[in-house]
From Swiss-Prot:
The keyword Magnesium does not apply. The gene is dys. SUPFAM superfamilies: DHS-like NAD/FAD-binding domain. InterPro entries: Deoxyhypus_synthase_arc, Deoxyhypusine_synthase, Deoxyhypusine_synthase_sf, DHS-like_NAD/FAD-binding_dom. This is Probable deoxyhypusine synthase. Pfam families: DS. Keywords: Hypusine biosynthesis, NAD, Transferase.
């Protein structure tokens, strides 16, 4: 009934013995790789990212692309990303409009922990928006609008002076510069936009109008009867692809899926794929969506290199990413 088994070698499955004097950090660093299931994927991600960090410290040129969806910034992961940007642990950012605007809004007023099970009609009547179990009152967007109208005026005047339409990445850089001028240091010290501006780390946002920024742009153009102000996304795709092409090695770290994920890995298609990839996602592959596409699918397209070191962690990024960053950076 049982066939004779072959001898196999590898990592023996083992967990921590909690009677030992052991910290949570030691459990994650020493045992996660050996526990199995998604813990082992977290362990592998730590190993890959540590390897990238060690090579960069030695002077190896590895361009780190980092992508995330707007809900990541809605959550407390925003401050962790700002830390990475401040300390130049990532080189290129790709996000959605929400990932830009919510970073700015949080410099003005905080988002509030709410609940998943709340009547939507009641929240609507109270002027409170819900992102999962995070509440965002409308006054946050009103405060944001006041700043954005002034910012759009600056961008329009710059466009008139130079005769040049700014790209979405230049828009994000200028927004960081605008924050530096207008906001107090305490308000901006945990901002992704601010540190990206200070460290000259480009933020690409191919869908810059898909969010509150787009709403504000609509109001600005309608109120001012403006037909001049434009944002160029075409030249950004050249810039993003060229960065990938001209990099000796690349690494792609992506939280979530959608547009940021594909923009990053598609840029790496032009160099026969990235050398390292870490995905953190809850999306499933069964509907053929890009969000759920596993690394192996990226290999088939040439977006992830055939010899790349990669891992996909299936789970909530708000749980996984703080552990991952702490174990790599501390």
């Amino acid at each position: 009934m049982l066939k004779e088994s072959e001898d196999i070698e590898g990592i023996a499955i083992e967990g921590p013995w909690l009677e030992d004097d052991i910290s949570l950090e030691e459990i994650i660093k020493k045992y996660y790789l050996k526990i199995g299931f998604q813990a082992s994927h977290i362990g592998k991600a730590i190993k890959i990212w540590k390897h990238i960090e060690e090579k960069r410290k030695k002077g190896d040129e590895i361009t780190v692309f980092f992508g995330y969806t707007s809900n990541i910034v809605s959550s407390g992961l925003r401050e962790i990303i700002a830390y990475l940007v401040k300390h130049k642990k990532i080189d290129i950012i790709v996000t959605t409009a929400g990932g830009v605007e919510e970073d700015f809004i949080k410099c003005l007023k905080p988002f509030i922990l709410g609940d998943w099970e709340v009547d939507g009609k009641m929240l609507r009547e109270k002027g409170i928006n819900r992102i999962g179990n995070i509440f965002v009152p409308n006054d946050r967007y009103i405060a944001f609008e006041e700043y954005m109208m002034e910012f759009f005026e600056e961008i329009l005047n710059l466009q008139r002076e130079t005769g040049k339409i700014i790209t979405a990445s230049e828009f994000c850089y200028k927004l960081g510069e605008f924050m530096d001028k207008k906001l107090k240091s305490k308000e901006k010290e945990k901002s992704i936009l601010y540190w990206a501006y200070k460290n000259n780390i480009p933020i690409f946002c191919p869908a810059i109008t898909d969010g509150s920024i787009g709403d504000m742009l609509y109001f600005f153009k309608k109120y001012n009867k403006d037909e001049e102000l434009k944002i160029d996304v075409a030249n950004d795709i050249v810039k993003l692809n060229d960065i990938a092409i001209n990099s000796k090695e690349t690494a792609c770290i992506v939280l979530g899926g959608s547009l940021p994920k594909h923009s990053i890995i598609n840029a790496n298609l032009f160099r026969e794929g990235t050398d390292y990839a870490i995905y953190v996602t809850t999306a499933l592959p069964w509907d053929g969506s890009l969000s759920g596409a596993p690394p192996e699918e990226g290999v088939s397209w040439g977006k992830i290199g055939a010899k790349a070191d990669y891992v996909e962690i299936w789970g909530d990024a708000t749980i996984i990413f703080p552990l991952l960053v702490y174990c790599v950076m501390k």
